[in-house]
Amino acid sequence: LENILVDNATLYEKKQGFMLKVLKDGRLLVVGNDSHGTAYGLMELSRLIGVSPWEWWADATPEKKTSFRLPTDYTDIQFPSVEYRGIFINDEDWGLMPWSSLTHEPWYKPGRIGPRTHERIFELLLRLRANTYWPAMHECTEPFFMTQGNREVARKYGIYIGSSHCEPMACSTPVEWKRRGKGDYDYVHNSKEVLHFWEQRVKETANQEIFYTIGMRGVHDGQMQGAKTVEEQKNVTEHVLKDQRELLRKYVNSDITAVPQVFIPYKEVLDIYHAGLQVPEDVTLMWCDDNYGYIRHFPTSEERARKGGNGIYYHISYWGRPHDYLWLGTFSPALLYQQMKEAYERGIQKIWILNVGDIKPAEYQTELFMDMAWNIGKVEKEGISNHLCHFLQREFGEEIGRELLPIM
């Protein structure tokens, strides 16, 4: 094994890589350069056999086979183009949350998306070669870290937990501030209580794999309280960043540069950033689309050179003004491909997060996004039409898949 790995040293060029190799004696070797890589390698073998990543979520029963063969000289080494790749469960009010808490794993009270559901979500993420998850956070839903068993199943599957642009420090602010907070969620007039609110979560999750969102907006997708002008908001945000990082340094790692952190200039926060906000060099800047698929800002040469790198938060599902798109997977795959290809080429390569709503019915767009995050050149090489055709044939069979392609 050691000689084989020496001969295939490219396996260790990046984290999360894997190798599938047929040995001279006919044995198949699956090797990962870390735990994630090993999982992705095993899932790749599953894909080769014909098992869909959506096997459970889409009732995609794999075709029965009596045998499966690989060439005697078969070697496949893969590793990700983007380091952190994941989804955001959002607008879960009518679909995922009631299905989870009332049907899939009924609780004594509704509102929980629990560990049994998350086990299925995290298995899907590994099958899609993803590793990051932003939990659902609407007021109807019990917070991820306040639901027994959730953090344990995230550790089991090796999933990094993050949070959206209005949930700093891994707190589901819309729900948790009403329970744990005191006074107004206002860093100008109530900073002591707000900081204590964040501190409680950081202390209890210090040993969890978390990609911390830092900064501050309003309680739920609105601008911050207490600061009226953009200049005031900029000054307050800089104080917030400093104080949040002190918490992370105190409880997570004294080397703050070793703690994954992301700042998300979403909606009005982009104006604050453009007003001259100073974001520490080691923090990842996560850019956003306009909620309809067009990225609002691509990193400059100075931003590309930052140690923290750049990320993207992208929507294929949205609830908000001027109109929603939630119930059908209507988002254009071609637009998704074009925007994400440009994002990667312009230096957005640290973290990609996709707002998938309830997961269903956007299976194809989700898989396209994750395939690009894993191998940015794969879709370009085969063409988006061929990529879609392969998806349809795998899910519905070759004949029906060909018939569906012109419809899709």
Spell out what each predicted region is:
Residues 1-79:
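Contiguous, structured surface segment used for ligand recognition
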Residues 25-61, 146-170, 175-203:
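Hydrophobic or amphipathic alpha-helical targeting/insertion segments
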Residues 29-32, 93-115, 131-141, 176-193, ...:
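The substrate-binding groove and active-site-proximal loops of carbohydrate-active enzymes
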Residues 52-111, 116-136, 308-311:
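An acidic-aromatic substrate-binding cleft motif
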Residues 61-70, 138, 145-146, 151-156, ...:
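Gly/Pro-rich turn-and-neighbor structural signature
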Residues 73-77, 175-176, 216, 228, ...:
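Substrate-binding groove of N-acetylhexosamine-processing glycoside hydrolases
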Residues 82-85, 128-132, 157-160, 208-211, ...:
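Loop/turn elements at helix/coil->beta-strand transitions in domains of secreted/extracellular proteins
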Residues 110-111, 115, 123, 135-150, ...:
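Trp/Phe/Arg-rich N-terminal binding region typifying the photolyase-homology
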